[in-house]
Amino acid sequence: PALIPFPRV
């Protein structure tokens, strides 16, 4: 679970 929501495309 990432602490910061990164847009993984």
From Swiss-Prot:
Residue list for modification Valine amide: 9
Alphabetic keyword roster: Amidation, Neuropeptide, Secreted
Any GO CC annotation of this UniProt entry: extracellular region
GO BP of this protein: neuropeptide signaling pathway; regulation of smooth muscle contraction
Compartments, record wording: Secreted
Family to which the UniProt record says this protein belongs: Belongs to the periviscerokinin family.
Function summary: Mediates visceral muscle contractile activity (myotropic activity).
Protein name: Periviscerokinin
Naturally occurring in which organism (per UniProt): Ixodes ricinus
Classification lineage: Eukaryota, Metazoa, Ecdysozoa, Arthropoda, Chelicerata
